[in-house]
Amino acid sequence: MSKKVLTVGEILVEIVATTKGDGFREPQPLVGPFPSGAPAIFIDQIGRLGTPAAIISRVGDDDFGRLNLDRLIADGVDVSGIEVAKGEATGSAFVRYRPDGSRAFVYNIAHSATGKLTLTPDAEALMESCDHMHVMGTALSAPGLSQVAREAVARITARGGTLSFDPNLRPEILDTPGLREALDEVLAQTNLFLPSGEEIYLFTEADDEAAAVKELLDRGVGDIVIKRGNQGASHFNRAGRTDVAPLSTDEVDPTGAGDCFGGAFVSFWLAGATPETALRFANAAGANAVTKVGPMEGAATRDELDALLGQSEG
């Protein structure tokens, strides 16, 4: 029987500027709202692949909240742990691409419904039904989210469940009080670690990748996957190293690609796939994600990933 995957964290909508520029200081055309939030994108990808999936979060009793609930339910995610808060607003993020490819964001998360998450009886019951916990670093940056996420980690690992961890550390949250302690606490229990690029150096004393990987393996992390964006990805464990090359795609919107990659890798990893197989499908999931505007719009089914790999490898 497949393990049921739980994540905890922010749910919001994303609204995307259709022109490139630096920020939102003038009226401009926008598209959206799109369902979003790194944990929500991750768990939606898990659900799309048919792996049992669930999320604990909090949304407002508004159209933005319902938009997210409808998408997650349609993609097979257990939403019994999502509290719908009357009189509160669902979080939002406005995104605009700069000419150099970087992004400008305006967030409303901390003061949205998600920012007031607490441990509810429904959330506690959901924790008891899950065998694997996935932590996003963003969920450790707000007190309510962090408390619930760490409680889920404690309960699931105490029963022998497994833990995956994607730091997903945006620059604007790195100085959050208590974040470093929370990150270290989660890493100490992690079975599968999924940093992007140079994030791995935030967790080690090493100054080169091989030494950083060795340090983490020596500390008890079983599997490490380094996401390299358009440079592919690498898996490391005690048995060695596996690399996959990037897939060639037409990038439209990279937001959410790393979350889709992570969701696909965790799904295949939990199913017992070899590192090479899990990397291939995760790579395809990330590549598919960048072809759609909207961070959750590119979450793919197994058939869609098979087709993409068939085109790329055939």
Residue ranges and their predicted role:
Residues 1-78, 252:
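Glycine-rich phosphate/adenosyl-contacting loop at the front of the ribokinase-like
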Residues 1-6, 154-155, 205-314:
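Conserved phosphate-binding/catalytic region of the ribokinase-like
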Residues 4, 13, 131-132, 192:
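Structural motif
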Residues 46, 196, 258:
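Short, conserved phosphate/pyrophosphate- and ester-handling motifs at nucleotide-, phospho-/glycolipid
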Residues 52-135, 306-314:
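Conserved N-terminal subdomain of the carbohydrate kinase-like
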Residues 132, 138-215, 231-233:
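Conserved beta-alpha-beta core of the PfkB/ribokinase-like small-molecule kinase fold
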